Every structure is written in C-alpha cells, then in structure tokens.
C-alpha cells in the first residue's frame, strides 16, 4: 500500500507582501515547485492550507461594501470563499506541474466543513482576532448592531472582533476525501482549518469561529487513516528553548519525551505549541503513525528521512 500523507501548508507558503491575486498565485507557484518530487512519488497526497491573510482581506472587503443591496457575508461563508479561491490557485499550479511531468494524476479541491461542539468551553473565551481594525467609537456603534460580538484592543492599533477557536470533532467530508486520495488524486481540503459547523437537528449550521489549521489537519489525517502528517512551517526543525542561547535542535523524538517538553513550557504558545499538540494527537491515534515538521524547502528531503523533525511513538 502506498504511503498516505497529509501535508499541512503553513501560511508562509502563500504569503506575499502584495495582496493581488497575481502576486499570491506567483507565491503558490514557487511553493508548489518544492513539492514537485512528492507529486512525482507514489505517495497518496492530501494538502491542507492556511487562509489568514486571504480571509482577512475578504472580511475587510465585506465590511467596506456592506449595504442593503450588498450585505456583508458572515465568517463561515467567507471561509468557504477563501477555500475556493486558494484551492483554485493551488489546483492551477499543481496541474501545471502534473502536466509538465506527463502525470496521469488529477487534483481537486473539497470545500470542507469541520464539526465542532457547541458546548466547547472555547466559545466562552474568544481569542482569535479577525477582520478590520476599528476605533473605540466605531466599536460602540457596531455593538448596538451586534450585541453578542466581542471586540478587543489589538496592540494599540485599534479594536478588532475576536471569535472562538473550538477544537475539531469531525471532518464531514472525510470519507469523500479519503476515497479521492486513495485513487490517483491529489486532494486539497480543510483550507483555513475548515468551515466550523455545529449539528442542528438533521443538518449542520455554520458558526462564527476559526479552527486551528494544525488541529484540523491532524483530525483529517486521523480520519482518513493517513500514515504521515507533514506540518510545513517557516523553520527546518523544531527547537526547544527557541531563540535562546541554549536552544537545541530536535531531529528525532518520541511522544513521551515530547510531552515532557510540553509540560516544561519549552514551546511557544500560538506558534510551535499547536503543531506539537497536533503531532502528539496524530501519533497516538494509531500504530506506526509519524509526524514530520519542517519547512517547505526541505519537504521532500524530510519525507525520505534526511531533514526535519521526526516524531513517533
């Protein structure tokens, strides 16, 4: 059986100083060239990705054009928009590479919904800033229209709306994603952590929240029974005591040791810690599961064991 891999692309893979579609597509073109050897391998591949800058721009556009005739779309719908947009860009560049290689593989995007628990305590403590900055006066007006919304000051730059970041419970499209990935298809899924939804009677309803991309990627990898979760970030390896005089590079580590480092506070919250927590969950989800954390440039070398941080039981 060919190895099945979920590749979680970090925001740096599609980040650019310019926010134009052309600039972002150029960044994605460069990024996908780094994954070309993986596309040429027999591995079955699912790609997840972030959407922070893109959904931020969408929310600003929605706010600025909001009117009776062009009402602003809610966060869950903007999440779907960003999945389609970034998925389209990724498809275009991956298809270009597959054509150059004369490959018979195909690529496609699944707009992905992620179930969350409406009773998740994280809903009581929204922390994820989204959308544009507002003045104090603007916030006072907004809260008349949105009494349940929470706004917090953001490092002296103004006020921003904050939403919850609940844990993913299930990926609604995981069976479809698995079926496609088990063929010759490269699947793009769980963009931006997926669209958070809650079960309501006999259907699902979108909620105003943002799911951590690494947690969503771990849940997806577990549900489709992937062998490897590869988390691509902006560093080649995981370090303990990062940016300190006594920083130490990790090349290979077991989960038991990793848990000790987590308990000792060796990883920064909001940056490496969620990746480490996702790695632990995936490795513990079944036998012979492994996680690789590295940067985009070393993805293939890491997969064959030459680079990156390798996490296992």
UniProtKB/Swiss-Prot annotation:
UniProt keyword annotation of Transferase present: yes
InterPro entries, A to Z: AceGlu_kinase-like_sf, Asp/Glu/Uridylate_kinase, Carb_kinase
Gene Ontology CC terms: cytosol
Predominant place of localization: cytoplasm
Enzyme class: transferase
Coiled coil: none
Pathway it works in: Metabolic intermediate metabolism; carbamoyl phosphate degradation; CO(2) and NH(3) from carbamoyl phosphate: step 1/1
EC number(s) from the headed UniProt entry: 2.7.2.2
SUPFAM superfamilies (alphabetical): Carbamate kinase-like (SSF53633)
Subcellular location: Cytoplasm
Catalyzed reactions: hydrogencarbonate + NH4(+) + ATP = carbamoyl phosphate + ADP + H2O + H(+)
Gene Ontology MF terms: ATP binding; carbamate kinase activity
Family: Belongs to the carbamate kinase family.
Name of the protein in its database record: Carbamate kinase 2
Source organism (scientific name): Staphylococcus aureus (strain bovine RF122 / ET3-1)
């Amino acid at each position: 059986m060919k190895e099945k891999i979920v590749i979680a692309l970090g925001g740096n893979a599609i980040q650019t100083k310019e926010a134009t579609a052309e600039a972002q597509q150029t960044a994605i073109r460069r990024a996908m060239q780094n994954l070309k050897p993986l596309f040429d391998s027999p591995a079955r591949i699912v790609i997840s990705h972030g959407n922070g800058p893109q959904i931020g721009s969408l929310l600003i556009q929605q706010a600025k054009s909001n009117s009776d005739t062009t009402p602003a779309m809610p966060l869950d719908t903007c999440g779907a928009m960003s999945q389609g947009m970034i998925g389209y860009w990724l498809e275009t560049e991956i298809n270009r590479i597959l054509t150059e290689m004369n490959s018979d593989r195909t690529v496609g995007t699944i707009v992905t919904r992620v179930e969350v628990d409406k009773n998740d305590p994280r809903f009581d403590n929204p922390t994820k800033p989204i959308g544009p900055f507002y003045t104090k006066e603007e916030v006072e007006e907004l809260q008349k229209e949105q009494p349940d919304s929470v706004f917090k000051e953001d490092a002296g730059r103004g006020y921003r709306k904050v939403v919850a970041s609940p844990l993913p419970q299930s990926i609604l499209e995981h069976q479809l994603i698995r079926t496609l990935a088990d063929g010759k298809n490269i699947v793009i899924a769980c963009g931006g952590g997926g669209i958070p939804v809650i079960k309501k009677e006999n259907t699902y309803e979108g909620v105003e929240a943002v799911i951590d991309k690494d947690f969503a990627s771990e849940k997806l990898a577990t549900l489709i029974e992937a062998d490897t979760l590869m988390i691509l970030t902006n560093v080649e390896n995981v370090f303990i005591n990062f940016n300190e005089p006594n920083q130490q590079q990790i090349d290979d580590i077991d989960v038991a040791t990793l848990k000790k480092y987590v308990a000792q506070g060796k990883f920064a919250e909001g940056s490496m810690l969620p990746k480490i927590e996702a790695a632990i969950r995936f490795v513990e989800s079944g036998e012979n599961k492994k996680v690789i954390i590295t940067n985009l440039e070393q993805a293939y070398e890491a997969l064959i064991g030459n680079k990156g941080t390798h996490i296992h039981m």
